[in-house]
């Protein structure tokens, strides 16, 4: 029999929720840190990390924790582990003895370990935390994906070759442009020099030779 999660149904929209938390004074709300997606190899052990920041130290008499599982976003939640003065493993038939608590609430760590992950374990794992007198409940959501085999390693050789080729091509283009620019500049300077010489020679011919004029 599935156990319902400790999760009161929200009575307001996501927009209202965002507005509500935006009005909470900085440092007064609980922050929960989890990976959005966790890829795990079939048959391996997976640590579902969940840590939190609170304004208050953890009092085990007041602190409470719930871990739940969902097959999909719209599916009902099944609670499989909780903390009430101590860790209580509910040992769902789905997980049996494969779930272990691996965190330490006093260190703001409430992570769990899932042994021998199976394809049926794929889904959403929710971490709910209450740490009175903090009035705000923390919530983290992890999407667990089970892989049938290890993903192939990315070969960076092709990327390096392409990058080097592009870089070399650009270097050659820049070099050619610089050479062309230098050649043009030299030609312009030579033309200016030739024009100046021609102008000076023209002036000399126009003035003539003073001795010839006397004769």
UniProtKB/Swiss-Prot annotation:
Write down the SMART domains for this protein, in alphabetical order: IG
- Pfam families the UniProt entry points to: V-set
- Annotated positions of the Phosphothreonine modification: 204
Q: Where is the signal peptide?
A: 1-29
Where is the protein situated, by its record's location annotation? Cell membrane; Cell projection, Axon
User: Would you list which residues are glycosylated?
Assistant: 42, 66, 74
What topology does it adopt in the membrane? Single-pass type I membrane protein
The residues on the Extracellular side of the membrane are 30-157
> Cytoplasmic face: residue ranges?
180-215
What Gene Ontology terms for biological process does this UniProt record contain? Answer: cardiac conduction; cardiac muscle cell action potential involved in contraction; membrane depolarization during cardiac muscle cell action potential; sodium ion transport
Supply the alphabetized keyword list. Answer: Cell membrane, Cell projection, Disulfide bond, Glycoprotein, Immunoglobulin domain, Ion transport, Membrane, Phosphoprotein, Signal, Sodium, Sodium transport, Transmembrane, Transmembrane helix, Transport
Entry's Gene Ontology cellular component terms: axon; plasma membrane; voltage-gated sodium channel complex
Q: Which GO terms describe its molecular function?
A: sodium channel regulator activity
Q: Which residues carry this modification: Phosphoserine?
A: 192
Q: List the disulfide bonds.
A: 50-127, 72-75
Question: Would the keyword Transmembrane be found if you checked this record's keyword annotation?
Answer: yes
This protein's record includes keyword Ion transport: yes
Q: Hey, where's the site called Binds SCN2A on this chain?
A: 56, 135
Its main subcellular localisation, reduced to a broad class, is: membrane
Q: Which residues form a coiled coil?
A: none
According to the entry, every stretch annotated as the Ig-like C2-type domain falls at: 32-154
Q: What does this protein do?
A: Regulatory subunit of multiple voltage-gated sodium (Nav) channels, that directly mediate the depolarization of excitable membranes. Navs, also called VGSCs (voltage-gated sodium channels) or VDSCs (voltage-dependent sodium channels), operate by switching between closed and open conformations depending on the voltage difference across the membrane. In the open conformation they allow Na(+) ions to selectively pass through the pore, along their electrochemical gradient.
Homology family? Belongs to the sodium channel auxiliary subunit SCN2B (TC 8.A.17) family.
Q: What is this protein identified as?
A: Sodium channel regulatory subunit beta-2
